[in-house]
């Protein structure tokens, strides 16, 4: 499911919850224990008190950092490139993945003729691909992906290193 579709569904559900107060946009500035509860201070100076804080704010979690919960992890010797492409033809709801010695490559249909390509490889190779102009990247895709993909038009691309990371604690009493 595309991120924007998921976000839209969440916002629509939020609108139907009478007991939900959205504090948006707001950033968490501090988090402190206070009498079997947590006191949160937001960037606008507002303070909140709650018995439960859920840190679901990503790999570089501000909640985890403010709660002084460390992480263990390491970098894999791989990186991943996500490439948004137009295939020029409507896509069926078919996803595929092929495995290569350098890492998997996958096709994820989005909507109409749009799709995401996922390319795992060495960090050096991904940096090389990221530096290519779209026309050159399209030629590399034609060479590296199965022929059934057909020609594509690159519209956006991004990459990130693959990292394994686990919190040292997953529960911290308030």
Q: What is the predicted function of each stretch?
A:
Residues 1-66, 74-79:
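Conserved N-terminal helical subregion
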Residues 169-174:
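Short FAD-binding loop at a beta-strand-to-alpha-helix junction that anchors the flavin cofactor
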Residues 56-162, 166-167:
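Conserved FAD-binding catalytic core of PHBH/FMO-like flavoproteins
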């Amino acid at each position: 499911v595309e991120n924007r579709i998921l976000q839209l569904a969440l916002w629509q559900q939020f609108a139907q919850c009478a007991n939900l107060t959205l504090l948006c946009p707001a950033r968490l500035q501090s988090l402190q224990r206070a009498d079997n509860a947590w006191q949160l201070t937001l960037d606008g100076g507002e303070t909140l008190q709650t018995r439960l804080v859920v840190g679901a704010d990503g790999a570089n979690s501000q909640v985890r950092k403010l709660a002084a919960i460390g992480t263990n992890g390491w970098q894999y010797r791989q990186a991943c490139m996500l490439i948004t492409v137009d295939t020029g033809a409507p896509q069926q709801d078919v996803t595929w993945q092929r495995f290569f010695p350098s890492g998997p490559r996958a096709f994820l249909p989005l909507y109409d003729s749009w799709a995401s390509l996922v390319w795992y490889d060495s960090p050096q190779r991904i940096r090389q691909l990221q530096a290519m102009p779209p026309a050159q990247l399209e030629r590399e895709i034609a060479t590296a992906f199965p022929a059934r993909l057909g020609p594509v038009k690159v519209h956006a691309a991004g990459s990130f290193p693959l990292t394994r990371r686990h919190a040292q604690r997953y529960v911290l009493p308030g």
